[in-house]
Amino acid sequence: MSGLFLVGAAGATSASQAAPADEERAEPVVVGHRGAPGYRPEHTLASYELAYRQGADWVDVDLVPTKDGQLVARHENEIGGTTDVAAHPEFASRKTTKVIDGVPLTGWFTEDFTLAELKTLRATERIPDIRPDNKIYNGRWQIATYQEVLDLTKRLGRELHRTLGTYPEIKHSTYFASIGNPTEPKLVDLLGRNGLNKRNAPVIIQSFEVANLKALSKQVKVPLVQLTSATGAPADFVASGDKRTYADLATPAGLKEISTYADFLGPEKAQIIPRTAAGTLGTPTTLVKDAHDAGLKVVPYTFRNENSFLPTNLRSSADPSDWGNAFAELDAFLATGIDGLFADQPDTALVAVRS
């Protein structure tokens, strides 16, 4: 297990303490973002397994609840873009429009399906134009439950002789609480039943919202990650009339507040190195230093190899699906002192970290 987790877990009961000395800092950790979706459809057991086999010690598992209160791995509760649900006539009447975190969305939603119903669906590639090779896997794998991911993690840990862990992310917390189907109690219960609600357990909980993390800091013994974005505000802030934004959370004062309930900052990478008007990497901000000064570890998201996601000067061609100079981007961010990163191609990120 990497040093990042060990320091984070120790800080779970004292997140506001000073950052560790340089000599205590470990090799930056690579988290498989939704598994290894550069190679397999995201959030499938196959995607998670590949990430672990490529060398990632952690995988990012976004969680949303089903109608019958089970936690499944999906990036959002609308599943039209990542499953074959539209091809199931028996579910045609489930298509609807909802407002999720202030945004109208039309499609099919996990909270309207039982787990048994969701298990009849199959995962599909989210961005087939960018990752056409992944289309061959459409229809191969079911939607995974978090319990299934935990079981896979334990099994592969034994096989690979490594301690492997999960980064569960609570999606749309305020929304699910508003419809009487909150995620947090289900997650706390699941961790407890798996013996994972304890210090040094291989679990780190994430959220883009704040109130739920503050509450969880009193309910769990594992580290917490405050996720932030380069734009916008936490959904719970908007719902409660709090005028603060993610930019406010990224100030020294905001980071100090985060350190009272969380151990990690998970910023959008543009908050660390913004891009210029021309789309190239700009000048790094002070966010990494400021977060370290507040006693927080910094694990930004998301690094991807395809030209479509890279700075303009690091692209290899006009084809958005071609791989560009991902190493140059990774090297630039690693030079800022980040403690880890989320990557769609964990194998590439691990080469950057270790070379």
Protein language model regions, located:
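Phosphate-group recognition and catalysis centered on beta-loop-alpha active-site segments
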Residues: 5-355
